[in-house]
Amino acid sequence: MNLYPKTFISLILIFTFVHASNEVLVGETTHVRDGDTFEIENTPIRLAALDCPENNTPEGRYATKIAKQFVGSQASCELTGVKSYERFVGYCSINGEDYGEILISQSACKVWRKYDVWKRYTEL
């Protein structure tokens, strides 16, 4: 029995599924949990490729304070197809600006290159 064709077809299907999951979620930012997690109309989103300090540190409280400025703003997130702790992971913009770049430029978060799967922040 020749397994090559079955393996090849399986790999194509997996590749297609992984890259076809670019769902976009658009809506109002209704809640901020911390620097890298917020909600669009009660749907939790984890920002892809960012590492923000936790809320139990002064740096984490600063990141959350910056993020809370955008509650009520229009958000658009390209979801990666991955979930982390029941949160959708995505690259997001707020009012048309890259949300990750905003947080990085304010020194609220850092790029987590290991998880920058779409290489959005390789130049930062």
Regions flagged by a language model, labelled:
Residues K6-T16:
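Sec-dependent N-terminal signal peptides
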Residues N2, F15-L124:
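Small beta-barrel nucleic-acid-binding modules, primarily SNase/OB-fold domains
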